[in-house]
């Protein structure tokens, strides 16, 4: 049976939670949560390890992006689950060129609904990720390649701003 990415993302959030509340290393936290479904699928295990590694290796940078958009919230006050859902989505947006940002944001919202640390978790996660995405998009820091990965509305807007004389 093929492991679904949502299942993998949920396990990533759980591994990050484990790292926050227990004295353990990344490999151990990840190994505890790799299900047989994930371990039998080479693509799934690779995605799991790459995503978890990207979050752990770039946590400081990811947290800076999140902090910049949590105006009245100190990072220490954000629920651990919500913080780790945000970190997971941010890692995908920043470091995974093959995953559309809208997919990362939607997956984070759905996972926030499932884990539901508060009754407003999904709205909080949506608001922060939307603000970060818009900021990154405006500053040209979204680096996505492949068909369907770039927000088409951004491309249309850029093309409309370009005058016909620019092509000559």
From Swiss-Prot:
The keyword Transcription applies. It holds the Pfam family NusB. The gene is nusB. CDD domains: Terminator_NusB. Keywords: RNA-binding, Transcription, Transcription antitermination, Transcription regulation. This is Transcription antitermination protein NusB. Involved in transcription antitermination. Required for transcription of ribosomal RNA (rRNA) genes. Binds specifically to the boxA antiterminator sequence of the ribosomal RNA (rrn) operons. Belongs to the NusB family. GO terms for biological process: DNA-templated transcription termination; transcription antitermination. The keyword Zinc does not apply. NCBIfam families: nusB (TIGR01951). InterPro entries: NusB-like_sf, NusB_fam, NusB_RsmB_TIM44. It comes from Prosthecochloris aestuarii (strain DSM 271 / SK 413). Disulfide bonds: none annotated. SUPFAM superfamilies: NusB-like. GO terms for cellular component: cytosol. GO terms for molecular function: RNA binding.
């Amino acid at each position: 049976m093929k492991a679904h990415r949502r299942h993998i993302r949920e396990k990533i959030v759980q591994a990050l939670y484990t790292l926050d509340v227990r004295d353990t290393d990344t490999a151990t936290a990840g190994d505890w949560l790799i299900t047989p479904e994930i371990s039998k699928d080479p693509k799934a295990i690779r995605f799991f390890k790459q995503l978890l590694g990207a979050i752990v290796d770039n946590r400081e940078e990811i947290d800076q992006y999140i902090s910049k958009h949590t105006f009245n919230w100190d990072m220490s006050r954000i629920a651990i689950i919500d913080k780790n859902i945000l970190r997971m989505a941010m890692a995908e947006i920043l470091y995974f060129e093959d995953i559309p940002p809208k997919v990362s944001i939607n997956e984070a919202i759905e996972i926030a609904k499932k884990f539901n640390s508060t009754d407003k978790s999904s709205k909080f996660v949506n608001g922060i990720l939307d603000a970060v995405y818009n900021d990154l998009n405006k500053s040209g820091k979204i680096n996505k390649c492949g068909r369907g990965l770039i927000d088409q509305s951004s491309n249309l807007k850029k093309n409309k701003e370009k005058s016909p004389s620019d092509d000559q």
